[in-house]
């Protein structure tokens, strides 16, 4: 990354505007999951300890732009952030008028999406945000794929713009996994539809040694290999795409392995009776909901010997006990591997948590959509703006 880093700058007495991703679930006026708040608090604390006069901004939910909505107020987030930091964090409603924060202090701007023009990357709004600071810090990887006033526009006009500790760590880990990976490199891409992840599959097919596919995506590849998938969810329109990707992987010496055996059931339910079948013998009235024991053993061997693993998506319906075995086997193999592993995406993080391997994954990515776009090789506007700023002010 060619952007400046917050840790390289002198923040003493400076007005520091930090864009964090504090978009967390709120239940009964309380933060229901504070993972993002705790992660952001570390960056905020660093800026405060460096003598910055810190104003934090974030979006929360999807309120109607340009209108105040008490339901989407940052107040519950400010309370939780204050508990973590050990100080009061005031929420400032009219923050665009200017906020007087003492040196080493912090305030939280009310929801940026209450400002008209935020999601449209409005130049006038971006300039007003930039006027509030001496240093703009982009630290929200989860929103870096969106060109909005608080993630992109403000960086164009701020006197100084840099990457915060969270964003820097995220880009470093992704770079390590994708730019110069230790081999063999394995990617796991799960999900219900090939159509939703076709760019990721395309990009990774040409980068990795093995690409393990899971969920409804795997069913489309099983159909492409010429097998019946019974009444499983799959996309007939993408069978040719799957065939092409398998051929392209083989042509470069890699592979997209097809499951040898699968776990099926007649109904999509946690009480359904699960059966194991070879992949060429799936009954017409059953659906594939997980990979079978032979396939798990094969994936286990591949993953334990991997130099790099990129994990995005489960291989079965892991939320239901009869169909959790495949994803559990992946999780345990990744945990046991000496290779560098990175996991991202909501379902993947839920699986990492469920199978208790959080501490054994080398890096857990906080960005859902941004993680996918990075895997696709796309330019993230929030990062590009920092790099352009650094180039213009070098």
From Swiss-Prot:
E.C. no: 2.7.2.3
Annotated Pfam families: PGK
Record keyword ATP-binding present: yes
Residues annotated to bind substrate: 21-23, 36, 59-62, 113, 146
SUPFAM superfamilies noted in UniProt: Phosphoglycerate kinase (SSF53748)
Pathway(s) it belongs to: Carbohydrate degradation; glycolysis; pyruvate from D-glyceraldehyde 3-phosphate: step 2/5
InterPro entries tied to this protein: Phosphoglycerate_kinase, Phosphoglycerate_kinase_CS, Phosphoglycerate_kinase_N, Phosphoglycerate_kinase_sf
Keywords: ATP-binding, Cytoplasm, Glycolysis, Kinase, Nucleotide-binding, Transferase
Catalytic activity: (2R)-3-phosphoglycerate + ATP = (2R)-3-phospho-glyceroyl phosphate + ADP
Catalytic class of the enzyme: transferase
GO biological process: gluconeogenesis; glycolytic process
GO cellular component, one term: cytosol
Protein name in UniProt: Phosphoglycerate kinase
Source organism of the structure: Halorhodospira halophila (strain DSM 244 / SL1)
The gene coding this protein: pgk
């Amino acid at each position: 990354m060619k952007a400046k880093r917050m840790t390289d700058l002198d923040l003493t007495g400076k007005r520091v505007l930090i864009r964090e991703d504090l978009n967390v679930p709120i239940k009964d006026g309380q933060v229901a999951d504070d993972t993002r708040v705790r992660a952001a608090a570390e960056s905020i604390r660093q800026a405060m300890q460096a003598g910055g006069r810190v104003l934090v901004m974030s979006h929360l939910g999807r309120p109607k732009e340009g209108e105040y909505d008490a339901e989407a107020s940052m107040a519950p987030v400010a309370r939780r952030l204050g508990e973590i930091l050990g100080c009061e964090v005031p929420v400032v409603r009219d923050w665009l008028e200017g906020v007087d924060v003492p040196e080493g202090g912090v305030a939280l701007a009310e929801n940026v999406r209450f400002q008209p023009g935020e999601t449209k990357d409005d130049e006038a709004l971006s300039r007003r945000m930039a006027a509030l600071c001496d240093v703009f810090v982009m630290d929200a990887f989860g929103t870096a794929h969106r060109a909005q006033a608080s993630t992109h526009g403000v960086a164009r006009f701020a006197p100084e713009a840099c990457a915060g500790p969270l964003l820097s760590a995220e880009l470093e880990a992704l770079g390590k996994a994708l730019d110069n990976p230790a081999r063999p490199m394995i990617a796991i891409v799960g999900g219900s539809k090939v159509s939703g992840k076709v760019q990721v599959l395309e990009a990774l097919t040409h980068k990795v040694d093995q690409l393990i596919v899971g969920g409804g995506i795997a069913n489309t590849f099983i159909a492409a290999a010429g097998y019946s998938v019974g009444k499983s969810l799959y996309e007939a329109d993408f069978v040719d795409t799957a065939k092409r990707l398998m051929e392209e992987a083989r042509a470069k010496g890699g592979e997209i392995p097809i499951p040898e055996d699968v776990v099926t059931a007649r109904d999509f339910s946690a009480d359904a009776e699960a059966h194991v079948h070879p992949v060429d013998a799936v009954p017409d009235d059953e659906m594939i909901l997980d990979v079978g024991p032979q396939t798990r053993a094969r994936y286990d061997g591949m993953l334990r010997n991997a130099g790099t693993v990129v994990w995005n998506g489960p291989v079965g319906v892991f939320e239901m006990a009869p169909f959790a075995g495949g994803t559990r086997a992946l999780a345990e193999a990744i945990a046991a591997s000496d290779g560098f592993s990175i996991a991202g995406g909501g379902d993947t993080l839920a699986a990492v948590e469920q199978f208790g391997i959080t501490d054994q994954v080398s890096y857990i990515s906080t960005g859902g959509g941004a993680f996918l776009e990075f895997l696709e090789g796309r330019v993230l506007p929030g990062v590009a703006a920092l790099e352009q700023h650094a180039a213009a002010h070098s």
